[in-house]
């Protein structure tokens, strides 16, 4: 009896995606229970970054980056897919634990009335603000996961000898990170902390072997 190659690919790696069930329940529980954060995240640089509602589109493109990179690595480079899941899911878990121990939030979001503009981007921003409270922000999971996806993809077989794809992956991820501060979804502090959680994995998973070994 011949084994089905698709079924073989499904086991066990796709089961890692069950983590999203745990993550979403945990995240939204925190979103509902943390009403008055103990720590307000703010940096002087935040006041110099203007609000631009049009960055909501690269902000929302995170979902496409997530789906695309996850599917491509799962199908074509299982080893890189495993590294992505390890980096991204462990980082998300760390963030959620930190949100519980050190409840934090933002005070930099403007109101629609203060902005005084009415366009499709502003309407999307208002829906986003209504759905996503300005709590549980540091480190930024949006930035942490974007960095993990760019790192895993750029070091995968798919991007090997394809510098254009590496630039595209990192450019997209950094645009998403920039969008978080231009839409006032995050402080620059959240972004730096989120990317720091990506950087710690580089020497662990992508350290070059020493010569002669």
Each language-model region and where it sits:
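Alpha-helical transmembrane segments of integral membrane proteins
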Residues: 11-19, 82-90, 164-169, 189
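Membrane-interface loops
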Residues: 31-44, 74-164
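Membrane-embedded catalytic cores of phosphoryl/pyrophosphoryl-handling enzymes
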Residues: 125-213
């Amino acid at each position: 009896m011949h084994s089905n190659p698709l079924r073989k690919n499904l086991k066990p790696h796709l089961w890692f995606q069950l983590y999203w069930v745990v993550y979403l329940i945990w995240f939204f529980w925190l979103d509902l229970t943390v009403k008055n954060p103990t720590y307000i995240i703010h940096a002087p640089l935040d006041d110099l970054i203007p609000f631009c509602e049009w960055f909501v589109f690269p902000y929302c493109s995170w979902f496409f980056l997530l789906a695309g990179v996850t599917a491509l690595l799962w199908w074509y480079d299982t080893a890189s897919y495993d590294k992505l899941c390890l980096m991204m899911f462990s980082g998300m878990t760390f963030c959620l634990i930190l949100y519980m121990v050190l409840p934090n939030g933002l005070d930099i979001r403007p109101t629609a009335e203060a902005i005084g503009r009415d366009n499709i981007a502003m309407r999307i921003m208002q829906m986003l603000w209504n759905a996503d409270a300005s709590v549980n922000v540091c480190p930024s999971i949006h930035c942490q996961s974007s960095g993990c996806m760019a790192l895993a993809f750029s070091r995968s077989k798919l991007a090997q000898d394809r510098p254009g794809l590496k630039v595209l992956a990192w450019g997209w991820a950094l645009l998403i990170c920039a969008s978080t501060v231009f839409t006032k979804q995050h402080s620059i502090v959240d972004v730096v902390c989120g990317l720091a959680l990506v950087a710690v994995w580089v020497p662990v998973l992508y350290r070059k072997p020493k010569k002669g070994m």
